[in-house]
């Protein structure tokens, strides 16, 4: 009878550190370890202490922090063929790291034994036994990673099984089946893992690489077959094409298979934030298409989809997005319908019927603007301004009569005339100078405009915009400290597109603030 709980070993700090173009500082590793402990993983593989001084330092530094659940594990290889376990540097570095858990990898593919290590099959079994037994004799919990297990099993089942049985006999607490080359398919993983589960009494684990795109699916199928320990990294970073993404594996195990893991379902709500922080640390922009936690994972663009989801969320969503700390989103675009527009209006407290001809007019105008280069799925606030105009709810709060930018090497000067008020401002670049000038003109009437900050600025160049050859699209993100919104401008000039997006962003804030304050519910 299989247990209902699945252990999680995170190897972001070890296998994830082997990702090309990624290098963790010691502070990065500590920060991630504390984040993983808060999430509720069972083991944190901190690194390979015999390979570099930074990992050695990590095992010393992490002792200064009190972890709530996770156990720190040190990684290493089985003993070298020419040394005894007692003399082996890798094994002794694990003991020296003063951790509770040692993760050992050893050979289970006969090809690696005879052609890489160039030793006999029996000699490799002795190496496995000696290494595991040595760590156990020092009081460590041992997780044995059977490297290249699935490939080895397919070529020599008897020897692969003998290798893991040897680790079990030596006292290994968990035996992990590794798809090191990442080439095994899900149905193979299921059949092979099930066979191992029937031959080995200790807990079976899984360590999958993503070279054929199946790391997550392979991990899930291994759990279905009876494995109760999974390994992976946050966001799937790792050697070559990466490891199994724990951000996907964990909710699949808990929400789809109904098994227990981490600290329970409350931990799942932290997945999006954990994913975001790790992306931030490695300097990679979050993948918006990432299952479960990506910004687009529960985003509905097609009008038919949006309409159905607004009636019954299960119609086009496999789970409630809030379970994993995410949110449902609707975007406005050329394939969107009235339901998408209504969603954003209802967020402002505006109730309208989707059959209202004014809504249909707004949708048509949005589609026409998209054909000219706009992309409102990236900047829905600009589309809301279009809808407010068609609904007759738009107020002329900002009337820019004139603007001009004089751009020198390190300084830009902007002159604007807003609502009859002429202002001049200096800034670092044209967008900054126009922003300052606009605020100077507006703050006398709308002092609340000073709450608004620019948080992101992006330019999409000509050739990247569909149906256009010469226009540029500028998207700007704003915040008032409580909510965020994006607007955009399209023009043949980067500066003009920026000014359009900037004016829209400030205008959106004032328009929506007026709507909320006046409690416009029906019109």
From Swiss-Prot:
> Effect of gene disruption?
Cells lacking this gene show slow growth in MM, and the addition of isoleucine or citramalate restores the growth of the mutant.
Per the record, the domain of life is Archaea
Q: Does the keyword Kinase apply?
A: no
A Gene Ontology molecular-function term?
Answer: 2-isopropylmalate synthase activity
Give the SUPFAM superfamilies listed for this entry.
Answer: 2-isopropylmalate synthase LeuA, allosteric (dimerisation) domain, Aldolase
Give the enzyme's EC designation.
2.3.3.21
What are the Pyruvate carboxyltransferase domain coordinates in residue numbering?
Answer: 6-272
Q: Name one GO biological process term.
A: isoleucine biosynthetic process
Family per record: Belongs to the alpha-IPM synthase/homocitrate synthase family.
Can you name this protein?
(R)-citramalate synthase
């Amino acid at each position: 009878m299989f247990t209902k709980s699945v252990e999680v070993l995170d190897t972001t700090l070890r296998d994830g550190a082997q990702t090309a173009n990624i290098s963790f500082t010691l502070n990065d590793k500590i920060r991630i370890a504390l984040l993983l402990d808060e999430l509720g993983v069972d083991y944190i593989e901190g690194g390979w202490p015999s390979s570099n001084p930074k990992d050695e330092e990590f095992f010393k530094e992490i002792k200064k922090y009190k972890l709530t659940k996770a156990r720190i594990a040190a990684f290493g290889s089985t003993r070298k063929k020419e040394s005894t376990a007692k003399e082996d540097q890798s094994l002794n570095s694990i003991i020296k790291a003063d951790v509770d858990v040692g993760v050992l990898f050893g050979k289970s593919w006969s090809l690696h034994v005879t052609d890489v290590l160039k030793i006999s099959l029996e000699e490799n079994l002795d190496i496995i036994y000696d290494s595991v037994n040595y760590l156990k004799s020092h009081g460590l919990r041992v997780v044995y990673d059977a490297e290249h297990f699935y490939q080895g099993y397919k070529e020599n089942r008897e020897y692969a099984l003998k290798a893991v049985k040897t680790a079990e006999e030596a006292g290994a607490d968990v035996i992990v089946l590794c798809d090191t080359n990442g080439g095994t398919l899900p149905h193979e993983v299921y059949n092979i893992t099930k066979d191992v589960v029937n031959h080995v009494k200790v807990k079976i684990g899984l360590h999958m690489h993503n070279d054929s795109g199946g790391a997550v699916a392979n991990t899930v199928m291994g759990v279905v077959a009876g494995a109760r320990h999974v390994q992976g990294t946050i966001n799937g970073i790792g050697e070559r094409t990466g490891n199994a993404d724990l951000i996907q594996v964990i909710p699949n195990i808990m929400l789809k298979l109904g098994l227990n893991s981490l600290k329970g379902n409350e931990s799942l709500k932290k997945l999006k934030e954990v994913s975001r922080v790790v992306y931030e640390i490695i300097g990679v922009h979050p993948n918006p298409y990432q299952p479960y936690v990506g910004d687009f994972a529960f985003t509905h663009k097609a009008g038919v989809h949006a309409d159905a989801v607004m009636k019954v969320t299960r119609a086009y969503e496999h789970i409630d997005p809030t379970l994993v700390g995410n949110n449902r989103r609707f975007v406005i675009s050329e394939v969107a319908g009235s339901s998408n527009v209504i969603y954003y209006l209802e967020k402002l407290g505006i109730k309208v019927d989707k059959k209202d001809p004014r809504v249909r007019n707004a949708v048509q105008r949005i589609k026409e603007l998209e054909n000219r280069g706009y992309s409102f799925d990236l900047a829905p606030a600009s589309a809301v301004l279009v809808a407010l105009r068609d609904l007759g709810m738009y107020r002329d709060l900002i009337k820019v009569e004139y603007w001009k930018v004089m751009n020198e090497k390190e300084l830009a000067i902007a002159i604007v005339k807003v609502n009859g008020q002429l202002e001049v401002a200096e800034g670092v670049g044209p967008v900054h100078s126009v922003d300052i000038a606009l605020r100077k003109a507006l703050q006398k009437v709308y002092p609340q405009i000073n709450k608004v900050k620019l948080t992101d600025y992006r330019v999409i160049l000509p050739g990247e915009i569909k149906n256009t050859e010469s226009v540029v699209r500028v998207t700007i993100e704003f915040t008032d400290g409580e909510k965020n919104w994006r607007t955009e401008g399209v023009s043949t000039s980067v500066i003009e597109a920026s000014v359009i997006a900037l004016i829209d962003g400030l205008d959106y804030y004032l328009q929506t603030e007026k709507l909320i304050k006046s409690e416009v519910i029906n019109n």
